[in-house]
């Protein structure tokens, strides 16, 4: 029988077993519903983390300068095509509409990593500056994969307990808000687990959140 612990205990266990490098903290949500592949949510984290890829024309590249943002056009696409691991560590990618057809060259690299820009979530836009500013301000979005599981990175162990705990709480509340009004939470979410890059996962008592 699997052990289920409080969110506080789960995060503290990850922090206690942390390695020397700044591991990411990931959450996996399993749903009961057969329609879970359609679940998605957009929300805002209190504490931002991660890096952003931006595919756009040169005039748009100088609008928002930040160390967490990498801009580029076709030359960036070729860099990623030549070195797949280039995208490691990036959390989101944005694109201007004219660039979308060109991204087909690296769709097989971006897609499995959840980095293919999606217009449904405002990631394909002419207003690159506004989209970048929103993400750096904490905007986050997640959707279930083909297996009906929602994976989310809520931060890095270097952020410390308090920031991770608050990001985790906001993420869970945003997921819970996608529940139909006539369905109880325990009939909607099957399980929620947290894990770090090198650590074991812990199942969380999400009903106590």
Swiss-Prot record:
An example Gene Ontology biological process: translation
Key word Ribosomal protein present: yes
PROSITE patterns: RIBOSOMAL_L1
InterPro entries: Ribosomal_uL1, Ribosomal_uL1-like, Ribosomal_uL1/biogenesis, Ribosomal_uL1_3-a/b-sand, Ribosomal_uL1_CS
GO MF entry, a single one: rRNA binding
Alphabetic keyword roster: Repressor, Ribonucleoprotein, Ribosomal protein, RNA-binding, rRNA-binding, Translation regulation, tRNA-binding
Keyword Zinc-finger: no
GO cellular component: large ribosomal subunit
Pfam (any one): Ribosomal_L1
Quaternary structure (record): Part of the 50S ribosomal subunit.
Protein family per UniProt: Belongs to the universal ribosomal protein uL1 family.
Function of the molecule: Binds directly to 23S rRNA. The L1 stalk is quite mobile in the ribosome, and is involved in E site tRNA release.
Name recorded for this polypeptide: Large ribosomal subunit protein uL1
Gene: rplA
């Amino acid at each position: 029988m699997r052990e289920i612990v409080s969110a506080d205990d789960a995060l503290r266990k990850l922090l206690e077993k942390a390695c020397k490098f700044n591991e990411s903290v990931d959450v996996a949500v399993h749903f009961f519903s057969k329609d879970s592949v359609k679940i998605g949510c957009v929300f805002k984290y209190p504490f931002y983390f991660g890096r952003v890829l931006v595919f756009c024309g040169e005039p748009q590249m100088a609008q928002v300068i930040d160390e967490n943002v990498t801009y580029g056009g076709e030359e960036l696409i070729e860099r990623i095509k030549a070195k797949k691991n280039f995208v490691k560590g990036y959390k989101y990618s944005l694109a201007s509409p004219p660039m979308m057809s060109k991204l087909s060259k690296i769709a097989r690299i971006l897609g499995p990593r959840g980095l293919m820009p999606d217009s449904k979530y405002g990631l394909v836009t002419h207003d690159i500056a506004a989209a970048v500013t929103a993400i750096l301000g904490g905007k986050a979005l997640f959707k279930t994969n083909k297996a009906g599981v929602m994976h989310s990175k809520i931060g890095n162990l270097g952020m410390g307990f308090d920031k991770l705990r608050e990001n985790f709480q906001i993420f869970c509340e945003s997921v819970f808000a996608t529940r139909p009004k006539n369905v109880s939470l325990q009939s909607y979410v099957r399980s929620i687990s947290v894990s770090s890059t090198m650590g074991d996962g812990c199942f969380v008592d999400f009903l106590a959140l």
